[in-house]
Amino acid sequence: ILKDNEKNLIAQIANDNSEGQIVLSGKIEDLDKLIIILKENAIKNIKLPVSAPFHCSLMSKATSIMKEELDKINFKQGNNKLISNVTANEILDFNEIKDLLIKQIENRVRWRESVINMINNDVNHFIEIGPGKVLSGLVKRINREVKIDTINNQVDIEGLKI
């Protein structure tokens, strides 16, 4: 779409949530221009109320701050497998964690690929912790066969059966 329109927009994919759902991030004025282009091409879009251009290059100042803070922390090897939302792969080298956390600020969240990777590696039960069911809904869009639980309060925790 953009090849025939403005090519210098700062609008980047921030989240690849599921088939047919991506989130864009960038300069407000550029996103507003992109919304017009999408509407002209009959592409459904919703402008989300967010406070910053998360997961895009405009977050470079926050990346620097995060790096300084993470450099003060000594991480220890954990017992559980971790999937990076930056790579959508399992983190095999424990020393990569800090770098991946830093990269996550300016790079897209590869949620769809992360979930597919987990399912392909025999994860069949997802638990969403916190208010709402947004992530559970995204997982269902990716694969309806997995078990999904949501934890919103103490009662939910007590009723959880793993």
PLM region spans:
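Acyltransferase
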Residues: 1-140, 149-162
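Expand to "…catalyze enediolate/carbanion chemistry for C-C bond making/breaking, isomerization
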Residues: 143-144
